[in-house]
């Protein structure tokens, strides 16, 4: 008699019996599900697995397609492998580095003995399409870590060797596409034919690889020129090359050799130098009366504002900070979102006419009565402090809409200095596994929310997609308006956040939907050596999340 087990499918809320050892693909077909953009992977007991995963016990299963962030990650990783194989096929002695998430794509540094040309981009794109058209299986293997290390040593992949050496895992998974072998952090597609849409084009001196978005998997994300952000990444990468710490494996090796404090001190000094240079630029730029600072959640904007204010004072400029929260319109006039809830992230939740009227008056030397928003009554009250700017004063305005031209539409551009601040993670796991900048910020937020706001990691993870949607709508479209960009990420920070983040993430129960993301983040953290945060200076930006800052928040 054939042995069977029970599978509960979250997609259609049905339960079926399937043979023991069935793959997720076989389970999917048994449920007779239809997904236009999938399945690409599945959550098995709230843990993401590839579709070739076999089930040997009763499980809860939720199949994922390209409408999910996890599904897009699986698709993107698989496309990275196709790209790496295509380049390897055409240029056997080449090197590919998946380097920078930028311009709604991924910048790839391709070393092929000469600068990448349009013809190279065309050849690589055609070779990728050929690999996809051949419907090649992407096979999943498991070996002892020692065997995997020997294999990658023979392949000359030192970045992977360094990464795996420091993990301490007994076994390691890897993937094979035809004759090409690689390691990827997370689930993969099972066949290249599942890749329906991608773009490859020459970008600066490399390639830009483009993928569909979860919002609309039927089309590629529109190209956005993010030259300023690209340059920020490039500057940090050059600095990391000088230090010899380009990947997590390099970092772990440096920690093992006793250079942790050096990495912390240099990272902090670099940030302070950038802030000092920015303050000097503001002080020396004639006519600047307001500094506008925007950036996504958990970028460390509050500490950045305080450190910038200190440096401005050393330049003879006295900053005056104004909170945009005090410019909220009355709650009854606040726009609502698609669910009917008040949308406080909407630009028009702010009293734009009053902002422009008062800023104009201040720059003319007039005294104004600032508003004060009463969060209990939901009313704007003219009970704030009275303010008149002196000649050496400059306003500091921080908020999600600070770079939106509509916020200060009546203020002349020469009076503004705009800064975009975000945690732009520049260290790589290895050459083919980049670190999403959103992971850095989410880990910061999980630690801060638990420590200071009484929120569990489960709550923070649950709200994160809504936070990201607001950023995509209100912040990212205006980031290239900035006169300067400041990278708040630091080379060592994940290692310092690790202990506190792991402790909070381990509290997320397996039975909840957020467990999949918590598990993914725990796996990500496992790649890093752990560092104590005692040696951080009291002005460190990370103190905003970890505590112990000399600034008052």
What does each model-found stretch correspond to?
Residues 304, 308:
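Hydrophobic positions on the alpha1 helix immediately C-terminal to the Walker A/P-loop
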Residues 301:
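Conserved lysine of the Walker
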Residues 286, 405-553:
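Conserved NTP phosphate-binding and transfer environment spanning the P-loop NTPase/kinase superfamily
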Residues 53-56, 60-73, 95-273, 278, ...:
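Auxiliary tRNA-acceptor-end handling modules of aminoacyl-tRNA synthetases
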Residues 329, 333-375:
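Conserved nucleotide-sensing/catalytic segment adjacent to the nucleotide-binding pocket
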Residues 291-293:
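Hydrophobic anchor at the beta1->P-loop junction of P-loop NTPases
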Residues 314-332:
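Short beta-strand-centered segment that lines the nucleotide-binding/catalytic pocket of NTP-utilizing
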Residues 356-414, 464-478:
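Glycine-rich phosphate-binding loop used to anchor ATP phosphates in small-molecule kinases
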